Amino acid sequence: SLGLVGSEMCIRDRSWGLIDGWGQVYDLDMLKAFYASFEKKIGRVRAVLQRPLTLAEKILYTHLYDDALLKKYKRGEDYVNFRPDRVAMQDATAQMALLQFINAGKETVAVPSTVHCDHLIQAYKGAGPDIATATESNREVYDFLRDVSSRFGIGFWKPGAGIIHQVVLENYAFPGGMMVGTDSHTPNAGGLGMVAIGVGGADAVDVMTGMEWELKMPKLIGVHLKGALNGWASPKDVILKLAGILTVKGGTNAIIEYFGEGTASLSATGKATICNMGAEVGATTSLFPYDERMKVYLEATGRKEVAAMADAVSADLQADAEVVADPSAYYDRVIEIDLSELEPYINGPFTPDAATPISEFAEKVLAHGYPRKMEVGLIGSCTNSSYQDLSRAASIARQVDEKQLSVAAPLIVNPGSEQIRATAERDGMIDAFLKIGATIMANACGPCIGQWKRHTDDPLRKNSIVTSFNRNFAKRADGNPNTHAFVASPEVVLALTIAGDLCFNPLKDALINQEGEKVKLRVPEGDELPSTGFTQGNPGYLAPAGAQVEIKVNPESQRLQLLAPFPAWDGKDFTDMPLLIKAQGKCTTDHISMAGPWLRFRGHLENISDNMLMGAVNAFNGETNKVWNRLTNTYEGVSGTAKQYKAEGISSIVVAEENYGEGSSREHAAMEPRFLNVKVILAKSFARIHETNLKKQGMLAVTFIDKADYDKIQEHDLITVSGLADFAPGRNLTVTLHHEDGTQDSFEVQHTYNEQQIGWFRAGSALNAR
């Protein structure tokens, strides 16, 4: 039953069973049905498209919501309805997703779905005490997620079980499949040949309720990999180099498909690393063709039956031979990378596309005056926490004792899953890290998502850290805007941690050991997979077991809040809106809705809205969280100003520059302005996931036709957006700026809304339009 008991939401149904040891958690019947029909579906696609197919096209066209939709779609233009195979959610975004799902009135999820508790654990003292603290401090949220999961048939991975993307790779990802996840690094599953796409919670709700899931047909970027890696080069360096080529927005609305002989030289987890960080170039997803390395990984993780089924259709789990032979005829853009010539890269600071080969990095550090001393090395995260990653890093750590070296900086390690941690412990890797003074944190995101209680006396001090993470935006890891965060492979992080010097190049530089001798670090080495197999440890998986469970959302809770529908559009133009903020420069979802200490409010829209745009830089004063409040004629915080406007019935508008909403998939960055009565986001361009999230929540997201019009907007303007009565696909709207001196400017703006999305806008949100 689903209903309200007094003023509390109450849901009763199933209890939980705990899977101990090596238990099957994937959906074998679903996979058997999938592979049994795959060749037939591919045949139908070939008959319609009448040309050779890329791997991405094979997966996309075999996942159309209905067979009647099978036709040729124009990349980058046509919106298409899909039927993904599964959904994955992490605990910070699952709260809002499940609060929305509760309102959908369904008895169970329509596709296999899971929740993973990895974001709410703060890294501080180490795995044991940190998990204990998180379990207690987040008990209300964990209980809610666990019990709602039980009620609706969703698998639940407890705190400490692992990072969502590593757990998905180990248990759920399968070649040729399609999944969505409420995290921007969901494309990690592309390492097993899956189209895996990061989405907001409302999109996940569409899939979980069995509705069609809409996506603009992506363009295709083909990356031809030649040769094989050697020396210090790692899979991470492939994507670090590519980020420099494509920039943070170069992959927007595109799938990056890797092909060529070089792909077969990379492990499945190495492929996953590359796909994972494709999010940093804005790609819809990334994927690799099925090969022997994927088969071996599937078998090593207890999925021999899945490997056998994939083997049977392996010819259709890669691009057709004609595509590989003439890629520029089938991809919208082709990039070539020779793995045999690739050197390690270090990217940053403050943006993941500032790519520098290690041979040039010292010069860059000195030229820009970056803090040369490396203060902390951090390895792990969903991007680099596989067995192979830790194995190669441990081979560097072991050289400290062997070569009588001292370690100059602290090392923090976040294993990717309990399976990885337990196996690494058995095989001596954890001990190798502990011997050089490392702190082993929980199998969780930790510092990568800002959950790091860093030991420092001066939290605003200018300093440098190097991580094997994916993002390095200002304030992201430790809340310090002056922390220069650089991204590299785990091997390079270990080398720089030992040296304590950003200018150290392990490929050519020597270190001075405790005997005063010059010694060089050997090239890292490590096993792709454990020779004696994985050990699971305590996996921490809870499966819905069918008994009754009761859920309560206390109306006085500061962590959870039931959602009320957003109001529908009133049929009028948006007139005389004050400018809330004109954001200058990079404005990611971290700037719009900060993570770190704010993660605890991710299930409470009113409370989380207090952080809205507090990290955005005001173009008129160069400061953060300081905007002009026309009601008080003073400078105040962004959310506080928006709250005052809302209380007076005043709508407002936000103006921004390029790639607004880059980064995380968190839909809170769209729901917060919607909640605080911001009607319009006007930007030079949007990141894909965030633009979709804005549309889902009934916001108006428009872009400048002439980007120079951004400069016309003044601090005290009242802004009108007109033409909404005739809002239609491809039809521009008009913005009029009423300046304080009585003059005005007017210009047209464009949008990407289709008929269905315009329906969301008119209804007030996608949920309202159901």
Language-model features and meaning:
Residues 511-528, 690-760, 767-769:
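Acidic, glycine-rich flexible loop/linker segments
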Residues 31-34, 38, 43-218, 602-654, ...:
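Long, structured ligand/cofactor-binding scaffold of large enzymes
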Residues 2-11:
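Short, small-residue-biased leader/transition segments that mark boundaries at the very start
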Residues 22, 26, 91, 174-308, ...:
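Mobile "lid/hinge" segments at catalytic clefts and subdomain interfaces of large enzymes
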Residues 19-29, 39-44, 50, 59-70, ...:
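Flexible inter-domain linker/hinge segments
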Residues 132-136, 141, 146-150, 154-181, ...:
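Accessory "access/gating" subregions that flank catalytic or transport cores
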Residues 259-264, 647-686:
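Extracellular/luminal Protease-associated
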